[in-house]
C-alpha cells in the first residue's frame, strides 16, 4: 500500500478497497470553464476520485461542463462507522500488513474525514458546486469580506446578508491556477469540543468558499489594527471598505490634548460644546512651564477654599490657633497671587510696573504649607490680636471673583491632585495620581531622558459618586466620513464602577481608575450592596437611579446631550488632521466623568474599545452595537431609509456647493499707468538674461543697490522679480560706441591718429546740422564723435568725407561681459531724455596761451581728493603711452586752469534727487591708450531705455569748446581734474 503525504493520514485497507470498487462505476467530474470559451476535456478513462479537479474562481462567470457523459453523478454509498473513524496505520509493515482500524472513541471529537469517500458523505460534488456558485455570486455583487479577530456578531450579520468570508490565512497559492477536490478539503479546521455537527460543517464550508476566493480582492475589511499590507490593498482596490482610519489623532492622550487646544475656534452653542479637564503635554518645555504656573495658582485657590470651608463648617478654632505651624503670612501670599491673576485677566496690569519677583523657595514653602493645611489638618498661627471677620470676608469675595476667571472652578477641590498618564498607552497602564510638584517633575524629567512622553491632567476631585463609589460612562460613537464630517451617536451606554469606595486620601488605582482591565484584578471591597457585583450598569439602570433621587431630567437635559455635543466638538477640532480616504469608518469609545453639577467631562477617546462579553451588560450591548454598525455602514449604503438600530445621526456637516462654471472670462479692466521698459528697440530682455547668466549677482554692487532701493516709478510687478545687473559703460559701448556685431575690445588703439595739419578746415555749422550729423555717427566711438564735433566747430568741412566704422578686433577683456552679436539700429528719443551742461566757474585767471598750464589751486586739489581720482603721475603715464611719456613728464604737473569752466551732465525731464542712484561705469580702452575716464549715467534712465545718443546730441549742440581746449591733451586732463564727468582719453585727441 502506498503511503499518503505527511499532511494527510494514511488510508486503511477498507478505504483502498472502496476506492478500487468505485473505479468501475461511471463518474462525472465538475470542472470550471469560461462561459465565452467552454472547455471540454478529451475522452479518456474516467479519473479516480482522488484526482478530481475543481477550478478556482478566476472569472466572474463560470460554467459547469460534464467530463465524460451527461449522466448524473453516482454518489458513493454511505460510510460505515469504521470508515468515518480516525484510522491509525501500522508502521511495522506498510506494504504487506494492512492498517488496523481502532474502534470509535467517545472522548475524542470527530475531525474532518480523512479520505475522499468519507468526505463525500458530508460534502458532495453537488454541494461543492453550490458553494462555488455562491462564491461566484458574492464576487459579482462585491460581497467579499475579511474579519481579523473574534467579531462573530459582524461575521454573522454579513453572512445573513449574502456575504462570503475570505479567511485571512497564509496558505500556499496553487501555481497551476486550478485546485483539486483534495486541495479544497484538506487542512480543514478541527472540530472543537461541544461543537455540533451542523456548526462544524458550516465552518468547513466557509473555509472551502474562502479557498474559491483566494485570488479575489476584499470588499470589506474589519480589523483591530490597520497593518502595512492594508495600505497596499487600499491603493490597489479603492472601493474596499475598512473599519480603521489611518490618522485619528484624538485617540491618544497626547493627541487629544493637542487637538482640543484649538477647540475655541469650533465652538458652536447647542452643537459643539465641551468640558475637558486642563491637560498639558509636559514633554514640551513651553507646556511644562504652563503646567507649573497653573499648579501654583491652583494651590493658592485650594488653600483659600480649604480655609474658608473649615472656618464655616467647624469654626475658627479648627483653622486658627496660637500654636499653629502655618504662618499667617501664607494667607496674604495666596491672596496677593490671586489678585495679580485677576488683574492680568482684566488687563489691569498693563499700566502698572512688573509684579514683584517671587522666588522658588517662597513657592516651595507655600506649597508645603498647603499640604499641611489639607492633608495634615494643620492650623494657621494667630495670636488673637487681629479680627478674623474682615479677612474672611475679603477672602470670600476674592474666591467669588475667581469663579468668573477660573472656568474649571467646579472641577477642583482642596487637594490639588493631578493625574500623570503615559502619552500613548491604554487600559490604564502607567497612570499615577500625584499632588506634589517635585514628584511630578521627577517623573516627567525622567521620561524626557528615557524618550517616553507623559501628559499631566487635572484630576476631577469632586465627581458624582454613586453609593460612595466612583464611576465613569463608556459611550460609543461612529464616524462614517470625515469630509464632510458625519457622526453617529449610540443611544445606549454603560457605567463602570471601581471596586473600592472613593477617597482622596487613598491614591491606589483600584479607587480611582474604573477601567475594566484594572478592576478585574481586584476583588470588591466593603461597598453598598446596591452596587452591581460585576461593577457595571447600563444606562437604563442609571436613569432609574436618577429618577429615585429626583434628577431624572438631568439625563435628558445635561448628561446625554452634553456627551453628544462634546464628541461633535472634538471631531470638528480634529477634522483637519484625520484621514480623508473614502469608504472608511470607525467605531470609537469615549469615556466621560460626571461632576456634582451633572455636567459630563470628556476624559479620553479609545480607537479600539473593548467589545468583548466580559459581563452580562457587555454581553448584551456589544453584539447589538456591532450589528447596528453593519446596519449603518452596509444597509444604509443601498437603502437610505434602512433601519439604523440604536444609532442616531448626531452631526452632518453641510458643505456649500461649488458654484457652477458659466464660462466667464474674468479679466482686469483698466489703463496702464507706467510704461514698459524699452531698452533701445526692444532688445533689453534678452540682453539682461544673457548678462545674468554669465555674471554672478553677488559680485555686482549695482544689483545690491537696486534690490534694496526701488525707484518710485518702477512697476510693482518688478519688485518680486530678480532685477538684472547693469553696467553703464557696457550699455554705452553697445548702443553708442561699438558696432553691435563687433566684439568689445579697446577702441582707442584702432583709431587713426591724424595730425592737425592733415585735418581739413572746418566751418561753423548751426546746431541743427550738428545734431543731424551726430545722429549719423551713432555707430562710431565717442572719441571720433567728439573729435569730429570739434573740427566742425573750428571751421572744418566734412561734407565730402564718408566716415566708416572702424573694424574692431575679436579680442575682448575677460571682465567686459558677454560678446554682443546682435545688430539693432539706434532709436532717437530726443523728447525722453535731455542733458544739460551746467557751467561751474572756478576761481583764477584763464591762461590758454600755454599748452601746459602752470597755475595751481588748492580748491582744485581738494576736489581731486574728494573725488578720489588717481594720482597725476598715473594719469600722465597712462595718457600718453610709451612714446610720449618722457616728453610729458618733463613739463610741470598737469593742473587745470583756474578759469576753465567745469561741466556736469544732468537731466531736465526730472531733476535728479539726492536718492537717485548713479553708476560709475567702467571705461573703455586699454591701459596703454590713455587714462580711464568715468562716465556718470543715471541707472533709472538707462534701465528705461532712454538712449544716450539724444543726450549727446543736445550736449554737443550746447557745448562750445575752443580749439585750444580740444587740441591740447593736457587741457582735457585738466577738465577731468576740475570735475567734468564727460571726458575722453587724452591719447585719442589730436596732438596740437
From Swiss-Prot:
Alphabetized InterPro entries for the sequence: TTL/TTLL_fam (IPR004344), TTLL_monoglycylase (IPR051437)
Biased composition (Basic and acidic residues): 7-26
Domain named TTL: residues: 295-645
Compositional bias per record (Pro residues), positions renumbered to this chain: 39-49
E.C. code: 6.3.2.-
Residue span of region Disordered: 1-54, 68-113, 746-766, 791-828
TM region positions: none
Keyword Repeat in annotation: no
Keyword field contains Nucleotide-binding: yes
GO cellular component terms, A-Z: axoneme; microtubule; microtubule cytoskeleton; sperm flagellum
PROSITE patterns hit by this protein: TTL
Recorded GO MF terms: ATP binding; protein-glycine ligase activity; protein-glycine ligase activity, elongating; protein-glycine ligase activity, initiating
Cell location: Cytoplasm, Cytoskeleton
Chain sites annotated for binding ATP: 457-460, 470, 472
EC primary class: ligase
PANTHER family noted in UniProt: TUBULIN MONOGLYCYLASE TTLL3
Role of this protein: Polylycylase which modifies alpha- and beta-tubulin, generating side chains of glycine on the gamma-carboxyl groups of specific glutamate residues within the C-terminal tail of alpha- and beta-tubulin. Involved both in the side-chain initiation and elongation steps of the polyglycylation reaction by adding a single glycine chain to generate monoglycine side chains and by elongating monoglycine side chains to polyglycine side chains.
Full protein name: Tubulin glycylase 3A
Protein source organism: Drosophila melanogaster
Gene, per the UniProt record: TTLL3A
Amino acid at each position: 500500500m502506498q503511503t499518503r503525504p505527511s499532511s494527510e493520514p494514511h488510508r486503511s485497507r477498507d478505504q483502498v478497497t472502496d476506492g478500487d470498487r468505485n473505479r468501475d462505476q461511471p463518474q462525472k467530474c465538475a470542472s470550471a470553464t469560461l462561459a465565452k470559451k467552454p472547455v471540454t476535456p478529451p475522452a479518456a478513462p474516467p479519473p479516480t476520485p482522488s484526482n478530481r479537479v475543481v477550478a478556482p474562481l478566476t472569472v466572474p462567470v463560470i460554467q459547469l461542463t460534464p467530463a465524460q457523459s451527461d449522466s448524473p453523478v453516482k454518489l458513493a454509498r454511505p460510510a460505515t462507522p469504521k470508515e468515518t473513524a480516525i484510522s491509525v496505520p501500522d508502521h511495522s509493515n506498510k506494504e504487506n500488513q494492512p492498517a488496523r482500524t481502532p474502534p470509535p472513541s467517545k472522548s475524542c471529537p470527530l475531525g474532518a474525514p480523512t479520505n475522499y469517500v468519507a468526505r463525500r458523505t458530508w460534502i458532495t460534488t453537488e454541494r461543492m458546486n453550490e458553494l462555488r456558485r455562491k462564491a461566484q455570486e458574492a464576487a459579482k455583487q462585491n460581497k467579499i469580506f475579511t474579519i481579523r479577530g473574534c467579531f462573530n456578531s459582524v461575521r454573522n450579520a454579513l453572512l445573513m446578508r449574502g456575504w462570503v468570508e475570505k479567511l485571512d490565512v497564509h496558505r500556499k497559492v496553487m501555481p497551476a491556477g486550478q485546485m483539486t477536490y483534495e486541495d479544497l478539503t484538506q487542512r480543514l479546521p478541527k472540530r472543537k469540543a461541544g461543537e455540533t455537527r451542523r456548526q462544524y460543517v458550516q465552518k468547513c464550508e466557509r473555509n472551502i468558499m474562502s479557498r474559491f476566493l483566494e485570488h479575489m480582492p476584499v470588499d470589506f475589511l474589519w480589523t483591530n489594527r490597520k497593518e502595512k499590507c492594508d495600505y497596499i490593498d487600499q491603493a490597489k482596490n479603492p472601493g474596499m471598505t475598512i473599519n480603521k482610519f489611518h490618522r485619528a489623532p484624538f485617540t491618544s492622550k497626547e493627541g487629544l490634548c493637542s487637538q482640543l487646544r484649538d477647540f475655541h475656534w469650533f465652538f458652536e452653542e447647542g452643537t459643539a460644546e465641551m468640558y475637558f479637564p486642563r491637560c498639558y503635554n509636559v514633554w514640551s518645555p513651553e507646556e511644562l512651564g504652563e503646567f507649573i504656573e497653573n499648579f501654583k495658582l491652583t494651590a493658592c485657590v485650594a488653600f483659600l477654599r480649604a480655609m474658608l470651608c473649615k472656618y464655616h463648617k467647624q469654626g475658627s478654632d479648627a483653622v486658627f490657633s496660637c500654636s499653629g505651624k502655618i504662618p499667617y503670612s501664607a494667607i496674604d501670599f495666596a491672596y496677593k497671587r490671586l489678585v495679580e491673576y485677576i488683574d492680568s485677566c482684566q488687563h489691569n496690569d498693563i499700566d502698572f510696573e512688573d509684579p514683584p519677583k517671587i522666588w522658588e523657595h517662597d513657592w516651595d514653602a507655600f506649597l508645603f504649607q498647603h499640604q499641611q493645611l489639607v492633608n495634615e489638618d494643620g492650623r494657621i498661627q494667630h495670636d488673637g490680636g487681629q479680627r478674623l471677620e474682615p479677612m474672611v470676608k475679603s477672602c470670600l469675595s476674592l474666591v467669588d471673583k475667581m469663579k468668573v476667571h477660573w472656568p474649571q472652578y467646579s472641577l477642583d477641590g482642596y487637594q490639588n491632585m493631578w493625574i500623570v498618564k503615559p502619552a500613548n498607552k491604554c487600559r490604564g497602564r502607567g497612570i499615577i495620581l500625584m499632588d506634589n510638584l517635585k514628584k511630578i517633575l521627577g517623573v516627567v524629567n525622567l521620561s524626557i531622558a528615557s524618550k517616553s512622553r507623559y501628559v499631566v491632567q487635572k484630576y476631577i476631585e469632586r465627581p458624582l459618586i454613586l453609593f460612595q463609589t466612583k464611576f465613569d460612562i463608556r459611550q460609543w460613537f461612529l464616524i462614517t466620513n470625515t469630509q464632510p464630517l458625519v457622526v453617529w451617536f449610540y443611544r445606549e451606554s454603560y457605567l463602570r464602577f471601581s471596586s473600592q469606595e472613593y477617597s482622596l486620601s487613598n491614591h491606589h488605582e483600584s479607587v480611582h481608575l474604573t477601567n475594566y482591565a484594572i478592576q478585574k484584578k481586584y476583588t470588591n471591597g466593603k461597598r453598598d450592596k446596591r452596587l452591581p457585583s460585576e461593577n457595571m450598569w447600563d444606562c437604563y439602570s442609571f436613569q432609574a437611579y436618577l429618577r429615585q433621587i429626583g434628577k431624572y431630567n438631568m439625563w435628558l437635559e445635561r448628561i446625554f446631550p452634553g456627551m453628544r455635543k462634546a464628541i461633535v466638538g472634538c471631531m470638528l477640532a480634529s477634522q483637519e488632521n484625520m484621514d480623508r480616504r473614502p469608504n472608511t469608518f470607525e467605531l470609537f469609545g469615549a469615556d466621560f466623568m460626571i461632576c456634582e453639577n451633572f455636567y459630563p467631562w470628556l476624559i479620553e477617546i479609545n480607537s479600539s474599545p473593548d467589545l468583548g462579553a466580559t459581563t452580562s451588560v457587555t454581553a448584551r450591548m456589544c453584539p447589538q452595537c456591532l450589528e447596528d454598525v453593519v446596519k449603518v455602514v452596509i444597509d444604509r449604503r443601498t437603502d437610505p431609509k434602512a433601519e439604523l438600530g440604536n444609532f442616531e445621526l448626531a452631526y452632518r456637516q453641510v458643505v456649500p456647493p461649488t458654484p457652477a462654471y458659466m464660462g466667464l472670462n474674468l479679466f482686469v479692466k483698466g489703463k496702464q499707468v507706467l510704461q514698459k521698459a524699452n531698452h533701445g528697440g526692444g532688445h533689453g530682455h534678452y540682453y539682461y538674461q544673457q548678462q545674468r547668466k554669465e555674471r554672478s549677482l553677488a559680485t555686482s554692487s549695482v544689483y545690491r543697490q537696486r534690490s534694496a532701493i526701488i525707484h518710485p516709478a518702477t512697476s510693482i510687478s518688478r519688485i518680486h522679480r530678480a532685477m538684472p545687473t547693469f553696467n553703464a559703460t557696457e550699455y554705452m559701448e553697445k548702443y553708442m560706441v561699438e558696432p553691435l556685431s563687433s566684439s568689445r575690445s579697446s577702441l582707442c588703439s584702432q583709431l587713426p591718429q591724424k595730425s592737425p595739419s592733415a585735418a581739413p578746415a572746418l566751418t561753423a555749422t548751426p546746431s541743427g546740422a550738428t545734431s543731424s550729423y551726430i545722429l549719423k555717427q551713432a555707430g562710431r566711438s565717442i572719441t571720433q564723435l567728439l573729435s569730429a564735433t570739434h573740427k566742425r566747430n573750428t571751421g572744418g568741412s566734412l561734407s565730402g568725407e564718408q566716415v566708416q566704422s572702424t573694424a574692431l578686433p575679436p579680442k575682448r577683456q575677460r571682465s567686459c561681459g558677454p560678446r554682443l552679436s546682435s545688430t539693432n539700429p539706434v532709436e532717437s528719443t530726443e523728447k525722453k531724455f535731455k542733458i544739460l551742461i551746467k557751467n561751474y566757474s572756478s576761481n583764477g585767471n584763464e591762461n590758454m596761451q600755454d599748452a601746459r598750464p602752470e597755475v595751481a589751486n588748492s580748491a582744485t586739489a581738494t576736489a581731486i581728493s574728494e573725488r578720489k581720482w588717481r594720482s597725476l603721475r598715473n594719469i600722465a603715464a597712462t595718457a600718453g603711452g610709451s612714446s610720449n611719456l618722457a616728453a610729458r613728464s618733463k613739463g610741470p604737473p598737469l593742473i587745470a586752469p583756474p578759469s576753465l569752466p567745469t561741466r556736469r551732465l544732468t537731466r531736465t525731464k526730472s531733476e535728479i534727487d539726492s536718492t537717485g542712484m548713479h553708476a560709475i561705469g567702467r571705461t573703455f580702452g586699454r591701459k596703454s591708450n590713455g587714462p580711464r575716464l568715468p562716465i556718470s549715467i543715471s541707472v533709472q534712465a538707462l534701465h528705461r531705455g532712454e538712449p544716450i545718443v539724444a543726450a549727446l546730441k543736445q550736449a554737443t549742440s550746447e557745448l562750445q569748446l575752443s580749439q585750444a581746449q580740444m587740441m591740447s591733451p593736457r587741457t582735457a586732463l585738466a577738465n577731468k581734474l576740475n570735475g567734468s564727468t564727460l571726458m575722453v582719453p587724452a591719447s585719442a585727441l589730436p596732438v596740437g
